[in-house]
């Protein structure tokens, strides 16, 4: 269970409302986002530690969910392969920027290393209208593109069984973006 409190002076607090979010009890976040970038269609997202969230309305006192609870694609490689936890968003980004940026703690076991966790790369959050409701999506912040040094791009490559495409690039870190149409294939490896 979560509670929303308000204060005029940050010393005296008033209980405003309660909200139930199943299977999680920590690291809440509550923030507005436009749906499909439309500033006339603002919804609020109530977020919890395990990447579960509600989309709804907030009148300054009470959050009202408009649809069932969702998860931000917990097994998606775009969201740390299901290892992301306890995400929080920045609230002081200039309004003219227009983004809601989030960073998460990531559970990671790295044998032989002196650390066991890390922070995910910052992600830009957006709300999008789909056939069965409004969904939250996350994508790496555009500032990461400034870190790229060498790039390789190709289009229209047709692959068959055992085919290989070599870019001639190497390094310790690679940022790979791929769009694949499976055609008759059941799997493709990278």
Which residues make up each language-model segment?
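Structural signature of eukaryotic scaffold interfaces centered on beta-propeller domains
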Residues: 27-40, 83-96
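Hydrophobic core segments of beta-strands in well-ordered, beta-rich domains
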Residues: 1-5, 15-20, 28-31, 39-50, ...
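Beta-rich accessory regions
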Residues: 59-74, 78-85, 91-190
């Amino acid at each position: 269970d979560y509670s929303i409190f308000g204060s005029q002076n940050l010393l005296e607090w008033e209980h405003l409302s309660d909200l139930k979010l199943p299977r999680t009890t920590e690291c809440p976040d509550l923030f507005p986002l436009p749906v499909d970038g439309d500033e006339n269609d603002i919804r609020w997202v109530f977020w919890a530690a395990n990447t579960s969230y509600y989309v709804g309305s907030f009148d300054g006192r009470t959050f009202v969910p408009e649809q069932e609870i969702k998860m931000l694609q917990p097994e998606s490689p775009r969201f740390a392969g299901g290892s992301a936890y306890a995400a929080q968003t920045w609230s002081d980004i200039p309004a003219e920027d227009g983004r809601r940026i989030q960073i998460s703690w990531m559970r990671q076991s790295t044998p032989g290393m002196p650390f066991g966790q890390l922070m995910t790369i910052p992600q830009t959050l957006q709300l999008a209208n789909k056939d069965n409701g409004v969904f939250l999506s996350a994508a790496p912040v555009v500032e990461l593109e400034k870190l790229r040094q060498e790039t390789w791009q190709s289009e229209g490559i047709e692959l068959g069984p055992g085919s290989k495409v070599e870019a001639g690039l190497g390094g310790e870190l690679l940022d790979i973006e791929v769009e694949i149409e499976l055609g008759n294939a059941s799997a493709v490896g990278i």
